[in-house]
Amino acid sequence: MSTAERAPILLTPGPLTTSYRTRRAMMVDWGSWDSDFNELTASVCQRLLKIVGGEGSHTCVPLQGSGTFAVEAAIGTLVPRDGKVLVLINGAYGKRLAKICEVLQRPFSTLETEENVPTTAADVERLLAADPAISHVALIHCETSTGILNPLEAIAKVVERHGKRLIVDAMSSFGAIGIDARKVPFDALIAASGKCLEGVPGMGFVFARSAALEASAGNCHSLAMDLQDQHAYMRKTGQWRFTPPTHVVAALHEALSQYEEEGGLPARQRRYASNCETLLGEMARLGFRSFLPAEIQAPIIVTFHAPRDPRYRFADFYQRVREKGFILYPGKLTQVETFRVGCIGHVDAAEMRQAVAAIGEALRELEVLEI
């Protein structure tokens, strides 16, 4: 992939580097009520449902805004006001789930583990057995603050066995790590346009179990975030209730075409895994230590311990690497200083090697010697 047309390269978990074709798709203006745009939206939703294997059981409801908008909409719509959510936390985005429940005044309890410790099915089993008031369990599949992968399928089986409902934030995994609605029972799985599908940010979407969505009328705290009302209106008219992000939808439609051309989820996962493996190997040669062990590291974003050298300052390091054509991500841990490097986006292993070379050059220029 040529870098000439797209510098700097974003090695972040989203927004991320997109292809020229995806950006070009935004050069066309669309009427938000026009039949062509309605068909575009319908096509996007059908293709998304196919990725998750949700045809016949789930409904794809798109929503304007960031992924967090869609997460809040899912909780607000699908959790009744007298429900109770068990929130599983091992990072910043799990904490955000709890904050959403607090703001929406949905009763909740939490299970928080260390940032490098995945939640286990045994943890969930114990807590559900102890508290029959819990109606829903909410978790992050891939916690973006570290890159840790939580055991979704095992947790989903426990939740189902207890007769509870599962809400999955799959923002950083959907499209690159397999999730099959026929094997993983969930009431809602939430993702967004600007992550592993390599679209641009601005649209979230919720795969809602159709029966649960139909039963949720009147639950939502908000007009704009009411997924049941959004779906009912779209089913009746083919249109969004309120002004849609037309260019974002068009870009996602094109990004999905490229996703399919590449070979779908297996091919996307292979490329990201190659990116991650290359990144880890090259960074280890520079002396960097990754925060997570390999067995729980998702090929989405890697957290590295910051250099121990007292001359290291992230802001200076970031700027030097940026000048060389690569944008990194600050750390988001509470206990140790780190920084993050994304493996996703329209990039390949060759560009990961170029990025690590730029990191090495930046450290030498800054005279950061102790890694």
Swiss-Prot record:
Activity regulation remarks: Inhibited by phosphonic acids and very slightly inhibited by aminophosphonic acids.
EC top class, as a word: transferase
Residues with the N6-(pyridoxal phosphate)lysine modification: 195
Induction of expression: By 2-aminoethylphosphonic acid.
EC number annotated for this UniProt entry: 2.6.1.37
Keyword Transport: no
Keyword Cytoplasm: no
InterPro entries: Aminotrans_V_dom, NH2EtPonate_pyrv_transaminase, PyrdxlP-dep_Trfase, PyrdxlP-dep_Trfase_major, PyrdxlP-dep_Trfase_small, SP_NH2Trfase/AEP_transaminase
Pfam family, one: Aminotran_5
Note accompanying the cofactor annotation: 1 pyridoxal phosphate per subunit.
Reported temperature dependence: Optimum temperature is 50 degrees Celsius. Activity increases from 30 to 50 degrees Celsius, the enzyme is inactive at 70 degrees Celsius.
pH effects: Optimum pH is 8.5-9.
SUPFAM superfamilies in the cross-refs: PLP-dependent transferases
Cofactor (UniProt): pyridoxal 5'-phosphate
Catalytic activity: (2-aminoethyl)phosphonate + pyruvate = phosphonoacetaldehyde + L-alanine
GO terms classed as biological process: organic phosphonate catabolic process
Keywords: Aminotransferase, Pyridoxal phosphate, Pyruvate, Transferase
Gene3D superfamilies: Aspartate Aminotransferase, domain 1, Type I PLP-dependent aspartate aminotransferase-like (Major domain)
UniProt GO molecular function: 2-aminoethylphosphonate-pyruvate transaminase activity
Assembly and binders: Homotetramer; however this is for an enzyme with a molecular weight of 16500, which is in disagreement with the weight of this protein.
Family to which the UniProt record says this protein belongs: Belongs to the class-V pyridoxal-phosphate-dependent aminotransferase family. PhnW subfamily.
Protein name: 2-aminoethylphosphonate--pyruvate transaminase
Native source species: Pseudomonas aeruginosa (strain ATCC 15692 / DSM 22644 / CIP 104116 / JCM 14847 / LMG 12228 / 1C / PRS 101 / PAO1)
Chain's gene name: phnW
